[in-house]
A protein has these predicted regions:
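Active-site hotspot residues in diverse enzymes, especially metal/ion-binding acidic/histidine motifs
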Residues: 1-382
């Protein structure tokens, strides 16, 4: 295959420095020999288009990126939202950077799709002004704005949020470009835009955890109107914004009138008994025992020591494992990752010939054409 002499080694070096990866690890990850990459970086040879595709996929760039002249400037190739996250976490690894880029690309694709559809019912993101609101008041106003009633599952909260013009993406449980590994500290992030802001939540083996992350990221968007990235440590952080986002999430998921249903005086000090006593409430509200206990402590209805004992007991138990899943349901993955609102827009564009099958595949997480047909039948109820 022909080598492209227009290959710009400076751009590959920039990507490697940005990703904090050396040539040996890059060669192993992309399947190009270390010697070939070394010679290309030294300007001795060009690279083939297929090799540029591999590099582009790895770094979240197009093959043409490596053919352009000059060294890229961060402000030219990264959005202000992306740069905000990088300022918060200077050593953000390449896996998370690629997911941020992917989320931004999906947002742009969705907006372009709405233009193609000439959608008159485009949703305006017009949240209540919560600038000076307390977390309790903000959570109450947010529930009213989202018209939250008996919603208690992740998908129900997600649908309510999407109806108000926020894109909610959930990282995949399978290995792939959308996967945030369960061992990775990042649990989610939000990218603030005046229209169609983004929330990305890591898939968890326990749904209540990802539901809390969803509410936490919603708090960041509504309370502070800024982009942020969160790790497991964020949920225990005493930093002002993290603390307020956590309080918001707790009150959003468990309003005071719901919490009042619990007779705290009857709760046991024994962690295992306590877990059993709160089981019905966990299922009713779609939250974890931790969220309930923290709300009770904040309401001065439970001693901190009870929760400390519970955490110690929980930490001694084997971690819950996800069942994994079957690739037989690959055609439904775009709905789980991108959300029902997004997938319906793509299928509508496909049905009205506004989108080709090939382009629809790219919009739907590179779904194979046969799986797109299965997805269409699934939505048609066949």
């Amino acid at each position: 295959m022909e080598r492209l002499e227009a290959f710009n080694p400076q751009r590959l070096q920039w990507c490697m420095t940005d990703a904090q990866i050396d040539i040996g690890h890059l060669a192993n990850d992309v399947g190009i020999s270390e010697r070939t990459l070394a010679r290309a970086i030294e300007g001795e040879i060009g690279l083939t288009f297929l090799q540029l595709q591999k590099l582009g996929k790895y770094f979240g760039r197009t093959p043409l990126f490596f053919l352009e002249e000059g060294t890229p400037e961060p402000q030219q190739i990264r959005s202000p939202q992306f740069r905000t996250l990088l300022n918060q976490q200077h050593n953000l690894d390449q896996k998370i950077k690629r997911i941020i880029q992917l989320a931004e690309w999906q947002r742009e694709a969705y907006i372009d799709l709405l233009d193609e559809l000439d959608a008159e019912d485009r949703i305006d993101f017009d949240p209540p002004d919560l600038t000076n609101a307390t977390p309790i008041s903000a959570a109450r106003q947010a529930r009213q704005w989202l018209e939250i009633g008996s919603e208690h599952t992740f998908e129900q909260f997600r649908s309510a949020i999407e109806r108000r013009g926020i894109l909610v993406f959930r990282a995949n449980g399978y290995a792939g470009k959308w996967q945030i590994p369960s061992t990775h500290p990042t649990i989610g992030f939000s990218l603030y835009h005046s229209s169609y802001p983004i929330i990305v939540v890591r898939k968890e083996s326990v749904e209540a955890r990802q539901t809390f992350t969803l509410a936490h990221e919603l708090g960041h968007l509504l309370l502070f109107r800024e982009s942020t990235i969160d790790s497991v440590e964020s949920l225990n952080s005493h930093a002002r914004k993290e603390r307020l986002a956590n309080e918001f999430a707790g009150h959003f998921l468990i309003p005071q009138e719901s919490l009042n249903q619990i007779d705290a005086s009857s709760l046991s000090d024994e962690p295992e008994v306590l877990e059993s006593q709160l089981q019905d409430f966990r299922r009713l509200w779609g939250v974890s025992t931790d969220t309930i206990l923290i709300r009770l402590i904040a309401s001065n209805r439970l001693e901190q020591a009870v929760y400390d004992d519970f955490k110690e007991w929980r930490g001694s138990r084997p971690a819950e494992q996800s069942a994994g899943g079957s690739r037989e349901w690959r055609h439904r993955e775009p709905k789980h990752i991108l959300g029902d609102t997004y997938v319906r827009a793509v299928l509508q564009a496909l049905d009205t010939n506004k989108l080709t099958l090939v382009k629809a595949s790219k919009y739907l997480d590179d779904l194979k054409l046969t799986d797109i047909k299965r997805l269409e039948r699934y939505y048609a109820g066949a």
